[in-house]
Structure formats: C-alpha cells, structure tokens
Amino acid sequence: MVTADGVILDHTGFMMRLIEAYAPGAQKSLVLGMAAGMIPRYLQRRGQQVAAVEINPNSLQAATEFFDFDPKGIEVYLEDARTFVRRHHRAYDLVVTDLFQGDCTPDYLLTVEFFREVQACLRPGGVVIINTYFDPANEIANDTIVATVSAVFPHVLELRSPSSAGLVSSACLVAADTPLSPEVAIAMADKDAMPSKDFHTLKAARLVDKQRLKNTRPVSDDHNIFSILFASSQLRYRSQFNQLPPNLLVN
C-alpha cells in the first residue's frame, strides 16, 4: 500500500529501508521472489544492476499489468530460486529473499543448504536481507528460522515488531559474513517519516545471540520439519486474512 505522498506502508517499504541502511554501496543485486516488482525497481533507481528471480509467471504478469512493473533494464528469470543461486557464485553485493508462495515460504527455501547456496552468491562484504514472518505464539518456529540462518552466517541481525498485538506478522533478518551493527537500523528510524510499526521495529533491532540458540537445531534438507513447526502459525495467519474485505488485493 502506498500513501498519496509516496510512503510505502507494507513490508516492502521496510525492506527498502534495510537496503539503504545495510547495503548503501551495492552495485549488483539479486532479488529472489519479485512479488509486485517494487524491490527490483527500487534497486534499479539506485543505479544498481539487478537480477530478479520469480518461479510463478502469473506473478510477473500481475506485476506488469497491475503494479506498473517495467522489466526493461532488469534481468528477469522465470526459475526456481534454488536452482538459480547454485549457478551464480561470488556474483552479488546484495541478495534480497522474499520467497512467499501463498501464505508461507516453501520449506526447501529455508534450510541450511539453501542459505549456504545464497551465501556463495555473495561477493566479499555482501549482505542478505530475508523477509519472513514470526508468530509470537510459536517461538520455537521463530528460533528455528533464526538458528538455521545463523548456522551459515556468522553475523545475523533480527528485526521484528515489538508490538504485533499477538498477531503473526512480517519480520526481517539481515545476514552477512562481516560484522553488522544494530545501531545502523536504530539511526535509520530517526532519519525520516515512516509508519509507526517500521519505526519501532528498527528501534528494536538486535544481533542474534547464538548462545541463546545453542539448543535449537538448524533445519537441513535431510531433516526439514518447517511444515510441521509452522502448521499452527499458518492457520493463525490465514485466519487473520479471513478478516480482510473480500475485494482487497493482498500482495
């Protein structure tokens, strides 16, 4: 959703702020899951060389017809994200993952092996920004996602809304092989006007405490239990959407 003065109110606008904060000098970026195409266009406007990977051709069609997405100057690949990253090593300064299919991320795109493949795509000093969701009623599942990413990247920053009113809500992780500072996100909160949720989420940025996760097992391809861990959360998430007006388009 975009206001009349151009402020983006959903998770897309929040991810743009994270890009500005943690990858200001990126020259070549990869977007896995293009949704409405707003992130690839934003990166292109920043002067970057951009590749966008989307498995669903209907998403590309919808982005073009309804969200004014123009693929000119953007490398668009209709392909599975996982097969794409396997072929591109040391190629990108920034990788953005927004890999939702329906109301969840496919579980094979949440494993240690997948994040290792994403890590291999990065140039030295590169950053990954991961869009996901957290359920305040299911901290085991939340911690498992964080532990899985942390098993690959030595530095992980967690950004989740401190006041989600008990609802399943979007969250982001920033991951890198080089140190990250939550102070960068905190400073971004004071930079310009933004939705209240984004402000408080940036202010609550924290580095992942790996000691806290020492008893949480990362998920692998061979033992992928995310569909089980998130079953109750997905039901809660769907029930939230059932309360929306039927004519509202949710991206």
What are the language-model segments listed below?
Residues A141-R160:
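Conserved Class I S-adenosyl-L-methionine
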